[in-house]
């Protein structure tokens, strides 16, 4: 039985078979035939589909090649670069985010009550105590002597056990310790200023006391001192009368302040809470010689409102 879709000869794979009512016969391949095998369809729509498929296949292949070339031309995104959506973020701090060194704090203005340290060098032949006293007056600041070192000669010390309370020592002595204070004003108490020194003699004896006369430096004398300003003079112990007067003054001041505050708050409250006179009575009206209290008037609640006028 013949296939109604095929008309004429059908050449498939180089085998030619005529369309007959019987089965097609087989023949040997003709190697000299250069024409490509063809198929003939009786339906024109199938011919159109076959032609369209054959003509569209090269275009599809060309389009796929162009897409592959465009993918190859695109640069690869490095991991961690941050330019791609799938790129990993770099770990750690970004560059330049570390703590930068801060500039040092410079104090441009010093407090007048602050202490200033000094290293003073007293020349040979100068009086140590007089030099320190002159330095305090010239600078206008008090001088607190912390320590000293050097050699001195012809020392006059104050000692209560000696006759007259003063001892004059001749020779050269080494300073072991020295402390004291000098105030810039001449009217300061004598006990508040002065110099106390301990000396070692050539034979190992140690003497000390308050300097009561010249203290001549026989070599360079180094003094470590601190200067101060705005020193307050206090007399101790504080007397009992002063201790009692101060609390009384504080209590009186507190009471007076509280009274003033109460008066101010009362005035403000009265101004804010003033009510219109009740029962057409003047505000200064005093019934039965006594002023009517507010709670006597309002104990029954506020009066009813007048009906609106139509």
UniProtKB/Swiss-Prot annotation:
Residues 31-41, 51-67 have a biased composition (Polar residues). Residues 112-251 form the PPC domain. It is found in: Nucleus. GO terms for biological process: innate immune response; negative regulation of innate immune response. One of its GO terms (molecular function) is minor groove of adenine-thymine-rich DNA binding. It comes from the Eukaryota. One of its GO terms (cellular component) is nucleus. Keywords: DNA-binding, Immunity, Innate immunity, Nucleus, Plant defense, Transcription, Transcription regulation. Residues 15-112, 239-310 are annotated as: Disordered. Residues 94-104 have a biased composition (Low complexity). Residues 301-310 have a biased composition (Pro residues). Residues 88-100 bind DNA. InterPro entries: AHL15-29, PPC_dom. Transcription factor that specifically binds AT-rich DNA sequences related to the nuclear matrix attachment regions (MARs). Binds the DNA sequence GNFEI (GA-negative feedback element I) in the GA3OX1 promoter. Negatively regulates plant innate immunity (PTI) to pathogens through the down-regulation of the PAMP-triggered FRK1 expression. Overexpression of AHL15 results in a decreased flg22-induced expression of FRK1. PANTHER family: AT-HOOK MOTIF NUCLEAR-LOCALIZED PROTEIN 15 (PTHR31100:SF14). The PPC domain mediates interactions between AHL proteins. This is AT-hook motif nuclear-localized protein 15. The gene is AHL15.
């Amino acid at each position: 039985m013949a296939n109604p879709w095929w008309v004429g000869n059908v050449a498939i794979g180089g085998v030619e078979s005529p369309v007959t009512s019987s089965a097609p016969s087989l023949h040997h391949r003709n190697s000299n035939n250069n024409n490509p095998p063809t198929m003939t369809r009786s339906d024109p729509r199938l011919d159109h589909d076959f032609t369209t498929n054959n003509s569209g296949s090269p275009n599809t292949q060309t389009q796929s090649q162009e897409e592959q070339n465009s993918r190859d031309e695109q640069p690869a995104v490095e991991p961690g670069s941050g330019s791609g959506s799938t790129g990993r973020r770099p770990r750690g701090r970004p560059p330049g985010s570390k703590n930068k060194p801060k500039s040092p704090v410079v104090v441009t203005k010093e407090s007048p009550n602050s202490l200033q340290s000094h290293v003073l060098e007293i020349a040979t032949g100068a009086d140590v105590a007089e030099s320190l006293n002159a330095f305090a007056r010239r600078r206008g600041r008090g001088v607190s002597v912390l320590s000293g070192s050097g050699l001195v000669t012809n020392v006059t010390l104050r000692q209560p056990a000696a006759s007259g309370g003063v001892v004059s020592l001749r020779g050269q002595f080494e300073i072991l310790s020295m402390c004291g204070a000098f105030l810039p004003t001449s009217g300061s108490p004598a006990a508040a200023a002065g110099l106390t020194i301990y000396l070692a003699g050539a034979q190992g004896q140690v003497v000390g006391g308050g300097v009561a006369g010249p203290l001549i430096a026989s070599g360079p004398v180094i003094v470590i001192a601190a200067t101060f300003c705005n020193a307050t003079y206090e007399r101790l112990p504080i007397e009992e009368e002063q201790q009692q007067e101060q609390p009384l003054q504080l209590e009186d001041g507190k009471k007076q302040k509280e009274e003033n505050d109460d008066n101010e708050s009362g005035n403000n409250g009265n101004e804010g809470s003033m009510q219109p006179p009740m029962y057409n009575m003047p505000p200064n009206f005093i019934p039965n010689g006594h002023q009517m209290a507010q709670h006597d008037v309002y104990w029954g609640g506020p009066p009813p409102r007048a009906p609106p006028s139509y």
